[in-house]
Every structure is written in C-alpha cells, then in structure tokens.
Amino acid sequence: MAGLALRLVLAATLLGLAGSLDWKAASSLNPIEKCMEDHDYEQLLKVVTLGLNRTSKPQKVVVVGAGVAGLVAAKMLSDAGHKVTILEADNRIGGRIFTFRDEKTGWIGELGAMRMPSSHRILHKLCRTLGLNLTQFTQYDENTWTEVHNVKLRNYVVEKMPEKLGYNLNNRERGHSPEDIYQMALNKAFKDLKALGCKKAMNKFNKHTLLEYLLEEGNLSRPAVQLLGDVMSEEGFFYLSFAEALRAHACLSDRLRYSRIVGGWDLLPRALLSSLSGALLLNAPVVSITQGRNDVRVHIATSLHSEKTLTADVVLLTASGPALQRITFSPPLTRKRQEALRALHYVAASKVFLSFRRPFWHEEHIEGGHSNTDRPSRLIFYPARGEGSLLLASYTWSDAAAPFAGLSTDQTLRLVLQDVAALHGPVVFRLWDGRGVVKRWAEDPHSQGGFVVQPPLYGREAEDYDWSAPFGRIYFAGEHTALPHGWVETAVKSGLRAAVRINNNYGYGEVDPQMMEHAYAEANYLDQYPEGERPEEQQAREEVSPDEQEPSHKHLLVETSPEGQQHAFVEAIPELQGHVFVETVPQEKGHAHQNIYPSEHVQVHGEVIPEWHGHGGSGTPQMHRVGDHS
C-alpha cells in the first residue's frame, strides 16, 4: 500500500509538472496570454528583488488597509525611507488572506487565498525574499470524483469520456476532456485576436457573457456548455464578461502547476509586517479624508460620535470597493472615478471546512486535488498527505454560493456533510467529529465580497478604468485596481505600482485647485474657535500626526518590549473595545507578530466586537460544533 501511495504521489507530481510545461510552451505562442500581459511586469519584478531607490525627500504616508496590497506598499516605502502608518478597520491583518488554525488538532484551513500558479513570478519572488517556504498545491488528482445527475465517475474517466456523465455531446465533442472542449471554443477567440488586434478584440470580449460566447461564437452544444459549468466550475462566470472568464482561465486550470505557503498563507502578511518599520493601528475604520494645499487628513472613528485625525503628505487606499464607498472625500472624487467605484462587481465566495477523525479519502487513493458535484457544495478540496483531516468540503463563488445564503452555521455544515457523504459513502457520517468552519466573504463587513468579476459592458466604453492615476494626494491599490482580478499577485502588483509612483513623487492629479482650496478652508474651520467653543458636530474630532500618536483610553496598546522584541499587551480595557496599536522601536526595525491578533476567538458567523460605528470585526474564527449555540 505504501508503494502504491508513493507511485500515486509521483504520478500526480509528474502530471502537474507536465501540465505546467505544456502550459508554458503554449503560453509563449498563446495570443490571449500575450494580449493580457502586464507591460510593466519585469519592472515590478525588479522592484520586488531590489526594492525602491532610497528617497531624498521622505514623506509621511498613511496606508489604509492591512491586506497584502497595503502591506507590500508599506514595506517598499518604509525601506525607501518614508514614514509609514498603516490603518486597518478589522481586528487582524491580511485581508482576504485568512488562515484558520485549529487549536485542538493543529490543522490549518485557508478561508481565503490558498494557491498561486507558477506563472506568478512576482509573488513567488516576494515569498522567497521574505524567507517563506513553498510547496506544491495539488490542483488535480485523477482519483478524485465527479458526480452530476446522480452519476459518479472517477476523474480519470471524465478526462477521457465526459459523455459517460450523461451529457448528450455531439460527435466533435465526444471523447475529449472538458479542458479540450473549452479550448475548442477559444479557437474563435484566437481568430478574433488575429483579425481585430488585442484592444478591439478585448473590447468585443468585454461586451459578451461567457455563456453567449461559448454558444454563439465558440459553437459549443448546450450539453457541452453545461458540462463545463458542472465539471470546470465555469457556471459561476456564465453571465459575467467573457474577457473576465479568459483572464480567470489563464490562471485557473487543472493543467497548471500551483504552489502554496508551507505553514499557512497568513505567514505572508505576518512576514511583510515584520519586515517594515512604522505603526499599525487595528480597529481603525476611516470615515473621511480631506485634502489640503500641503497635506491630507485622514479621519478615523474612535467611537460612535468621536474621531481622530492623522495628517500625512500622501494617502494610499487599499480597502475594498464597498469599503471605499463608505468614506467621505473632500473634495469629492471625480464623477468618472465614482462611476468606476460603483461599477466594481464583487461576487460572493464561500468556504466550508469539516473536521474528520482521520483522512478517509486516502483509502480511495486521493492525495489532493478536488472533486466536483452538482450538489450545493460544488467543489471539495482534499489536504495533501500529512496535512491532517480538515477537509475543504465546499468552495463556491458567484451564483454557485447562493444555496448557502441565509443558512445558519449548523444548517450549512449539515448540508455540506450530506454532499460529501454522497461522494464518499456513510463512512463520512461516522468519522465526522461534529465540528466545522464557515466563511462567507459576502458577509464580511470589510470586504463585502470574495473578489471582483466584471459583467459585460453593454452600451458602455469597454476599456478598464486606470486606477493607478492618483486623485490629488490619494493613491489607490488593491485586487480591484489591477488585472487579473481575484489573485494575490494582482494585489501585490497594485501595491508595488502605487509605491513606485509615491516614491518617484509622481505628482497630484484630477483635483480642481478651487475645490482643493475650499476643502482646505473647511478642514481648518476649527481653528477659528477657541478650545471649548467649537461647533458641537466638531467637538469630538482630535488631530494627531503619525509621529505623535498616543493611545486613547479606548485603545488596546501593543508595544515592543526592549528585551525580547515581543509585543506586550498594555492598557487593555475589555468593556471599551477600541484600536489595537502596534509600533516598532526606532532602533530595531521589524515586528514580532505573535500577538498581533486580539485574544478574542469567535465563530465565523459571530462577532469579535460590538457593532459600534456600524462595523463588526470579521474575527478570528473558532471551530464550530454543531448544536453549540453558546
């Protein structure tokens, strides 16, 4: 049995490597890949490798958002000599990188990002630079299952004869793998690129849904399209832009090779934080931003009726699109930028983990990869051998996540358990230990969605908005500001671009000088009044520069101890939940991150802090046991 397992692991590894080599060979000739290339990719790779030039004009930079885009930009700017302060509305860092760690077993589950394709060289280089170890993420295992229409087959059968699943494929489609059938439809896209050129072709693709293109342009039969939706999870993209589907497929295919971070993806944001100097303020939601002649002021909610103000030279906003819409800008954003912000289309994404007493899938010779089902769970990902028995029992996005909307955690876990048992038999019920974790990104108060996927641009200009251009002293970064959407490297690229522009003193654009003057005068309105005689609505606003921040009575202060560089909790007042303030000692660059996260633990569907100012923390999830409503 051990010899068989070893052969299966070796076969899966060779298959993944062969798929990667096939993809690399194809990508050098693939016009779609060439069309979607980043013109500045090699430059950004150099920035990750060598860093930015040391600045001769250090600026005070406030970075809003401690996801990977914000942390990467903060690291690069800090290394270049700028004074950086990071503000995060949540009670943790990482954004949509979110690793669950089961205290009982030590197993981990990725509630957010979990893989990176081999083509993402910038992200691979960043991980190596930070000393993070990578290992293979097994995307495909031929011994996994596909179950649709109550027919269940091993995936090595589906690859050769998908019609055995009950799809009435035509003669051209029979005997071809789902991936090959999808490639048949892309042949028309290749012809369009050659005939129209990259820009015109992508404009055309932006005006079609994936479903329209597959049926009308790709000339696939309806059963073949349904096969792709069920087996390749393309159904979630059917009514979205064909251009977006092309970008997604370039990074998401069973024929590509993927990596993951050994020990958990949250080691990436932790390593970034440890490598930069400056301050991090958690539980610090930004409510408004005011630009003046010579500075920009960032207003943070400290309670329901009071604010604190930070003054900086430049602000970098890396929060999600919905979070940005809750910020008041003075002067207001341009109409075009507001329209681009409202046009961002976030799709839901949900993950459900179940904890088992042992990895029963090994008995079926499954060492990783994913099974597919047309039941609500849709995709089931298996941990690699030696990675425990915490099963990603459901991964859904876009419309496929709808069956779980509104369900309680208990209902969700039981529904997913039934789906897993349909694939693997009653042993699933016997081995489940009654615990699980649910993460619905659409219900997260800070992201309010899984990732951006744009719908077709019917009757509108099909070109993507250029988020890299600053709005006065305000810059933007994040997964929504770059392509392809939905990947960690995209967020990294956006953070690098913003850091380069800020370091090069790119300049300030898009702001009407008269509006800037008006905003500056309004921001300084308080100065007309002696202390204690200010207008009531301004009473609670307090101004402080990043250099002079002091913890208020509502803050949880985290300081670096001189001896061990470990964070020591000071002034924690449980009944007054406020900011968590993390700062490094000027002489000693870097953070010790063991205690960055608050000590509160909650179920994913619970809350870490009361809903003051309309914000609920996404929390540090705890394993939920069915029937436990405490």
From Swiss-Prot:
Catalytic activity: an L-alpha-amino acid + O2 + H2O = a 2-oxocarboxylate + H2O2 + NH4(+); L-tryptophan + O2 + H2O = indole-3-pyruvate + H2O2 + NH4(+); L-phenylalanine + O2 + H2O = 3-phenylpyruvate + H2O2 + NH4(+); L-tyrosine + O2 + H2O = 3-(4-hydroxyphenyl)pyruvate + H2O2 + NH4(+)
Amino-acid positions noted as binding FAD in the UniProt annotation, renumbered to this chain: 68-69, 88-89, 96, 112-115, 286, 479, 486-491
Expression induction: By interleukin-4.
Pathway: Amino-acid degradation; L-tryptophan degradation via pyruvate pathway
Keyword set, alphabetical order: Adaptive immunity, Cytoplasmic vesicle, Disulfide bond, FAD, Flavoprotein, Glycoprotein, Immunity, Lysosome, Oxidoreductase, Secreted, Signal
Disulfide bond entries: C35-C198
Coiled-coil parts of chain: none
UniProt region (Disordered), positions on chain: 532-554
SUPFAM superfamilies xrefs: FAD-linked reductases, C-terminal domain, FAD/NAD(P)-binding domain
Example GO molecular function: L-phenylalaine oxidase activity
Keyword Lipoprotein among record annotations: no
Gene disruption: observed consequences: Mice display an accelerated B-cell egress from the bone marrow, resulting in the accumulation of peripheral follicular B-cells.
Expression by tissue: Primarily found in immune tissues.
Localization, UniProt: Secreted; Cytoplasmic vesicle, Secretory vesicle, Acrosome
GO cellular component: acrosomal vesicle; extracellular region; immunological synapse; lysosome; sperm midpiece
pH dependence remark: Optimum pH is 4.0.
Family in the record: Belongs to the flavin monoamine oxidase family. FIG1 subfamily.
Name of the protein in question: L-amino-acid oxidase
Source lineage: Eukaryota, Metazoa, Chordata, Craniata, Vertebrata
Gene responsible for this protein: Il4i1
